[in-house]
């Protein structure tokens, strides 16, 4: 019975990974058809209600909100808003779905940036090989954008570092960096405390972006399809996947789940390509594998105790 229970919770972890792998497609669709600010506000409003209601029912996560310093609410809240804005706006500025696939890969650099930012924030120690692992990940991003048969850096920089594409790339890097810093500040200020401010952060984000949406001209093409995608992004991705992940880490085979999670860049780029109808090219596969390998390598650059703690987060 124990074995079956562990299998069940491990399976929930796999489901969470699959759900996260599909999230970028819905962010893209909502940003283009509803508008980045309007969509982000609605998704976070619904998600916040789900999270906060659950916390109130279970009487956990908010009852001890005074136990964490004010800096947690200010800095982590600000980073959460930045992460959300850049995640949606980045998907709305690019013109082609092929660019979206590469941007998804960039966004999944967040485990790498989480590990790197532990050095200044949590005073973690890493070996010099960490620099090499970062270069491997960045090489993966560059290769993923090269077309088959066009493995030339001059071609890459000439074609991609201009216009709306470069804006999308920069915003995607901000998505990854902001989430990495957010993760470590949460750990610094709220570790071992029964406080979870995600619901509050989502609600604050919804209010701020909802206010911005009033002054921005956006398409707002609502339909049954778009409404269902809003519900999926807010409830399934925002609440259910996180719940599944937490349960799998606590009660499932954590090592197996975290191992599979390391390949989220591959899973997400493949699923995004399939859902958007974009051809899966060899450079994209090689690039996503390099990002996954670089991330795994970066974890090996920390000592065992730090590596185990960060593995749960990333």
Feature annotation, model-predicted:
Residues 1-41, 47, 82, 86, ...:
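Glycine-/small-residue-enriched transmembrane alpha-helix faces in small-molecule transporters
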Residues 7-12, 37-54, 70-75, 132-139, ...:
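Hydrophobic alpha-helical transmembrane segments of multi-pass integral membrane proteins
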Residues 23, 59-100, 143, 234-252:
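Specific transmembrane alpha-helical segments of multi-pass solute transporters/efflux pumps
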Residues 25-33, 62-63, 91-96, 145-164, ...:
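Membrane-interface helix termini and inter-helical loops of multi-pass transporters
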Residues 38-41, 45-49, 88-123, 254-273:
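Specific alpha-helical transmembrane segments that line the substrate/conduction pathway
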């Amino acid at each position: 019975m124990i074995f079956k229970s562990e299998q069940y919770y491990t399976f929930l972890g796999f489901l969470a990974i699959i759900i996260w792998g599909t999230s970028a497609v819905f962010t893209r669709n909502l940003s283009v058809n509803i508008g980045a600010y309007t969509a982000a506000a609605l998704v976070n409003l619904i998600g916040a209600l789900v999270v906060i209601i659950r916390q109130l029912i279970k009487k956990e996560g908010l009852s001890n909100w005074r136990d964490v310093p004010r800096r947690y609410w200010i800095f982590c809240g600000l980073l959460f808003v930045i992460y959300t804005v850049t995640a949606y706006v980045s998907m709305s500025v690019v013109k082609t779905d092929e660019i979206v696939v590469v941007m998804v890969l960039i966004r999944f650099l967040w485990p790498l940036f989480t590990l790197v930012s532990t050095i200044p924030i949590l005073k973690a120690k890493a070996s010099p090989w960490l620099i090499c692992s970062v270069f491997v990940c960045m090489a993966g991003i560059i290769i993923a954008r090269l077309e088959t048969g066009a493995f030339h850096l001059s071609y890459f920089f000439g074609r991609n570092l201009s216009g709306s594409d470069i804006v999308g790339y920069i915003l995607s890097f901000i998505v990854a960096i902001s989430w990495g810093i957010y993760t470590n500040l949460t750990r610094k200020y709220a570790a071992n405390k029964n406080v979870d401010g995600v619901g509050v952060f989502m609600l604050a984000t919804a209010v701020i972006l909802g206010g911005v949406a009033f002054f921005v001209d956006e398409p707002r093409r609502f339909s049954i399809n778009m409404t269902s995608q809003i519900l999926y992004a807010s409830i399934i991705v925002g609440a259910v996947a996180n719940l599944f992940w937490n349960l799998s880490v606590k009660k499932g085979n954590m090592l197996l789940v975290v191992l599979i999670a390391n390949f989220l860049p591959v899973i997400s780029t493949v699923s995004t390509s399939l859902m958007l109808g974009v051809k899966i090219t060899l450079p994209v596969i090689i690039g996503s594998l390099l990002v996954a390998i670089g991330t795994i390598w970066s974890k090996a650059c920390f000592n065992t105790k730090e590596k185990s703690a960060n593995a749960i987060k990333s």
